[in-house]
């Protein structure tokens, strides 16, 4: 006697149903408020261990990504290594008058 298989194999094509997709309107993000001094402004350095402590320099750029020392300042005079720029935190610079 031969056993019959009870499994049925039907090869059917998948049905392509039309789908209605509804997307909500994207909310435009408010522009982020810029932090720090403006580029080109003069700032006084408040970091005591800096070569340029209490001196005035010009802001080259301010990084808005949230790094620790976002303010790049360029000075007229150079330090012992011949460097004229340095990075400072927002609380280490104040606008010069």
Swiss-Prot record:
Gene3D superfamilies in the record, alphabetically? 2.30.30.50
Cited function: Stabilizes the interaction between PsaC and the PSI core, assists the docking of the ferredoxin to PSI and interacts with ferredoxin-NADP oxidoreductase.
Full protein name = Photosystem I reaction center subunit IV, chloroplastic
The GO cellular component terms are: chloroplast thylakoid membrane; photosystem I reaction center
Organism lineage: Eukaryota, Viridiplantae, Chlorophyta, core chlorophytes, Chlorophyceae
Q: Give the species.
A: Chlamydomonas reinhardtii (Chlamydomonas smithii)
Q: Which InterPro entries does the protein's record reference?
A: Elect_transpt_acc-like_dom_sf, PSI_PsaE
Q: What assembly does the database describe for this protein?
A: Interacts with ALB3.1, which is essential for its insertion into thylakoid membrane.
GO BP annotations listed = photosynthesis
